């Protein structure tokens, strides 16, 4: 469906996708290997989506940065920064060079998630 949309105009997808794509995207990858959100199948499907012509904007700009967007309310997870990066902005690959900023605002509280931000250049 996204590929079909992308044929007409570039696509931007934002949301809680409930998948930590790579080991860098969660605090404890070894102990979560078979848990929902980090199963091999989910991660493979996420890779398939990216390989279909889409870019994970945060990871594109910050390939080695360990930053999370969600923490369980249990076990003082946010206080311990034992989180997951499951909130994303994905863009069509043809928008990749227009990405100016992709951030996760861990300083903002009020939910078990924090806001994610994307700034793209306009095509003026």
Model segments located where?
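Short, charged/polar surface micro-motifs in flexible loops or helix N-caps
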Residues: 55, 95-96
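Hydrophobic alpha-helical positions that pack around
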Residues: 90
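Short hydrophobic/aromatic beta-strand or adjacent loop that forms the aromatic wall/cage
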Residues: 85-87, 113-117
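Short, basic, low-complexity termini and linkers enriched in Ser/Thr/Gly/Pro
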Residues: 121-124
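Short proline/glycine-enriched turn/loop segments at secondary-structure junctions
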Residues: 77-79, 105-110
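Low-complexity, intrinsically disordered Gly/Pro/Thr-rich segments
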Residues: 97-107
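Metal-dependent phosphoesterases centered on the DNase I-like endonuclease/exonuclease/phosphatase
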Residues: 1-82, 86
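Short active-site-adjacent structural elements
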Residues: 65-68, 98-99, 112
């Amino acid at each position: 469906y996204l590929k079909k949309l992308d044929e007409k105009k570039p696509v931007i997808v934002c949301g809680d996708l409930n998948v930590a794509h790579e080991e860098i995207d969660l605090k404890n990858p070894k102990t979560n290997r078979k848990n929902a959100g980090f199963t091999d199948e989910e991660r493979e499907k996420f890779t398939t989506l990216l390989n279909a012509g889409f870019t994970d904007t945060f990871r594109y700009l910050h390939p080695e940065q360990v930053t999370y967007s969600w923490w369980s309310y249990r076990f003082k997870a946010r206080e311990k920064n034992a989180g997951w990066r499951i909130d994303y902005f994905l863009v069509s690959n043809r928008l990749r060079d227009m990405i100016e900023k992709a951030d996760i605002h861990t300083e903002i509280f009020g939910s078990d998630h924090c806001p994610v931000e994307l700034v793209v250049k306009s095509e003026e």
